[in-house]
Amino acid sequence: MHSQTTKDEQSKDDSSNEKQDAIERRRLQNRLSQRNHRRKIRDRIAKLQERVIASELRAVATLNGWDQASPPAASMMESKPQGDFDSNPLASVSEDPAISNPPQRNVSSNLCRSCCSLLNQMPSSSSLPSPTSPLPFDLGLTNGVDSTNSSPSTLLNSSPSSSQLSPFSLDTSLSMTGLQSQNEFSFPPYPDPPGSQQYPHCPQYYVATEASLPHIMQRLGSATSHPKAIILIPHGHGYAPAPFTGANAADSTGLRSALNGNLNLQNPGRHCLRPDRSAKSSDLGTSGDWMTAPSSTPFCPLHPSQSSSLDNYQSMML
């Protein structure tokens, strides 16, 4: 009898132990499954966060224009040394497609070094195509020709090509300053210059005097609705257009006298100079004797503080 009772107790204990073991196993399995589930959830959350961050970065890049495949022309041209622009011959300049194309020309050849450094620090989205020659001083750069390495006859021969006229060419610059070059050179009028369709929001700059301002506004009123900026040069600053004696396009003496008359800006306190360009010598002599006269003062169109005489320039947006 006693042996049977002990066996029954042992069997009960074994059954209870088995039940407890099964319960413990289930608890352990539940804990492991919960841990695995939490780990999977953490991995999914991390992947979703990475996707959200990547999509936000792409949206910001597309908004600011950082995802452009081609680098801007200003950064590519500024990677070259400063002396390469003045030391290249005329043939290499005319054969270079990046210089012969007006919208892709570098602006740094007409600006000072401080302005060029500021332009390089700007992102590629804000690098709008600034005009290469907003004032009629560097006439050689309007057709992709370096004015320091080319003669006046070369500039005259390259300027009358009507298919390569930019909004700041010889025709527009002389007509804006009061010289009626359409009657002398018989250039056709261009209300929409080439390259303006590519950048419709880029303003077009014109230089005018007080006498020619009504004629310019009447002429620009019939043009298309592009942003335009007129730089008004008042009287009394030495900017008097000299009579253009060279009616013939091949007369280099007339162009030289006209340039010396137009560039006679009395600006004693200069802040933005180009000594490296005026010190260069071309094939026909020094370029400073006809492009920059002793009384002429080349200045940077983007420099904020030139002198007290340049503070009277009035910009009018149409």
Curated annotation (Swiss-Prot):
This protein's encoding gene: xanC
Disruption phenotype: Virtually eliminates the production of all pathway metabolites, including fumiformamide, melanocin E, melanocin F, but also the sulfated xanthocillin derivative BU-4704 and xanthocillin X monomethyl ether.
Start-end of Polar residues biased regions: 293-318
UniProt biased composition (Low complexity): 123-139, 147-171
UniProt feature, compositional bias: Basic and acidic residues: 1-27
Molecular function GO labels: DNA binding; DNA-binding transcription factor activity
Keywords: DNA-binding, Nucleus, Transcription, Transcription regulation
UniProt region (Basic motif), positions on chain: 25-40
Chain intervals for the UniProt region annotation (Disordered): 1-39, 71-107, 123-171, 269-318
Name the UniProt record assigns to this protein: Xanthocillin biosynthesis cluster transcription factor xanC
GO cellular component terms attached to this protein's record: nucleus
Leucine-zipper: region residues: 41-48
Protein function: Transcription regulator that specifically up-regulates the gene cluster that mediates the biosynthesis of the isocyanide xanthocillin and its derivatives.
Segments crossing the lipid bilayer: none
Induction of synthesis: Expressed during copper starvation via the regulation of both aceA and macA transcription factors.
Family: Belongs to the bZIP family.
Species for this entry: Aspergillus fumigatus (strain ATCC MYA-4609 / CBS 101355 / FGSC A1100 / Af293) (Neosartorya fumigata)
Domain bZIP, first and last residues per copy: 20-52
Location(s), subcellular: Nucleus
